Amino acid sequence: GYGLIEHSSNKSFHLDSGFIRLNEKDTLSERLFMLSRELGKIIDRLNPNCGAIEKIFYAKNAQSALSLGHARGVILLKFSERQLPIHEYQALKVKQTVVGAGRADKGQIQHMVKILLNINDTLQEDQADALAVALTHAHLWRAENNW
């Protein structure tokens, strides 16, 4: 999932969000190529000034961890190619920042993201997660830079 917000003063605004759908039947290299191509298009279209992603802390199994690692590599590469900084946050920090509780579940995250960004439409889990990371970055960057 991806999400773009704008943060000014003490308010965040939802600009865009979605997800990249990959075909599970494709080979790993084909899926990574598609991810790279589609993410590049999204970055070019939305023109963000930075990126923020969740750090991998836990995966259900080794294969999931490897797949997540490959996808993260593509994401880091696409931002690096465009000389855009990318920031990483632990899932616990994202949950604490957005919901106020480190053990928040996906439903709580979706609910708070919709409230914080004044979104009435349904959000997919991946969209809500991406927007939660964006909100975390905006909040922490603002605090760190006394803005």
Regions found by a protein language model. Name each.
Residues 1-147:
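Phosphate- and other anionic-substrate recognition elements at nucleic-acid/protein interfaces
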